[in-house]
């Protein structure tokens, strides 16, 4: 265990530059002769040498409404069936306790994937039509919060 060897090429030696002509990387340190790339810094990304760059030549277009987009945490009826008992209330807190959702989003949407065999009362933000009909057919209740 303690005398294992690294595979060949696993650790590469650091390039030591500017230490004389015998090293192979002396004098100009592998940077060639004069010019911008031989100096200390290179221009930032998108810089086109003083020419007006592409991102400024093209017009701005469109808008984004993502700041106001409503996102729902999706929970399937099959998961509810596995984690909840008959007659239990399914809401944000109980879903959090049963680790079916994470803390970040309080808006919950129920979808009809999986089988539901238990009467549960749902207190959620949204529910699909197929899931709603399944819950009502079994005898559960739905309250939109």
Swiss-Prot record:
GO biological process terms, alphabetically, are:
translation
- Entries under NCBIfam families matching the protein: rplO_bact
Q: GO MF annotations for this entry?
A: rRNA binding; structural constituent of ribosome
Cross-referenced Pfam families, in alphabetical order?
Answer: Ribosomal_L27A
Keyword terms of this UniProt record: Ribonucleoprotein, Ribosomal protein, RNA-binding, rRNA-binding
Q: Which InterPro entries match?
A: Ribosomal_uL15, Ribosomal_uL15/eL18, Ribosomal_uL15/eL18_sf, Ribosomal_uL15_bac-type, Ribosomal_uL15_CS
Q: Assembly and interactions?
A: Part of the 50S ribosomal subunit.
Protein name as annotated: Large ribosomal subunit protein uL15
Its function, per the record, reads:
Binds to the 23S rRNA.
Q: Which domain of life is it from?
A: Bacteria
Q: Where is this region: Disordered?
A: 1-58
Q: Which family does it belong to?
A: Belongs to the universal ribosomal protein uL15 family.
Task: Mark out the compositionally biased spans (Gly residues).
Answer: 19-33
Q: Name one GO cellular component term.
A: cytosolic large ribosomal subunit
Which gene is annotated as encoding this protein in its UniProt record? rplO
